[in-house]
Amino acid sequence: MRAMIRLVTAALLLGVLTAAPAAAQGAPPPGGPPPSDSRFSSNELLNAGHSFFGTVSRGLAQIVEKAVSQWGLPNGYILGEEAAGAFIAGLRYGEGMLYTKNAGDLKVYWQGPSIGFDAGGEGARTMMLVYNLPNTGAIYERFGGIDGSAYFIGGFGMTALTANNIVLVPIRSGVGLRLGANIGYLKFTPKATWNPL
């Protein structure tokens, strides 16, 4: 049992060290935004979000407005569900559908480890705004970032993850209680897998 705990701890540390350079990339350099007809307007995002989140979406307009003011209009978004749990080290698993205007829709799965001062569990509906996605296959990447949110029962949380100039902004509304700050990454795959690394 101890050997397994050591192996999992070593794997999480390796994953965090691998994700750190991606997290340090920050916002993508300015380089012409995608054509406006391939991006989603704030109204389109709100309509999709209200349909998806339902009655808990009162704060959605404010959180989408904040994301749009920081990163502009996305050229894709993901609607899905996920579950996560942590006590110092954590895991997150999810699945959803990536929507784009000009590259089609795509079923995606995500997994990821995290480590930090973090405890709790949650089940969440997730809307991820996707920026600078050159094609749907480019989503299959590890996106690193720092998560420092408090998830309250029925509340919203927003973070940012980045890899290869693609920015993901997960917006979560869920059931559970999770408090803390952690560093980790999300890995996107075309098929479901239990391997978070």
Q: Where would I find each of the regions flagged by the language model?
A:
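Bacterial N-terminal signal peptides
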Residues: 8-19
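Bacterial N-terminal signal peptides that target proteins for export
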Residues: 1-9
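Small-residue-enriched, tightly packed secondary-structure blocks
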Residues: 25-197
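Sec/Tat signal peptide C-region and signal peptidase I cleavage site
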Residues: 20-24
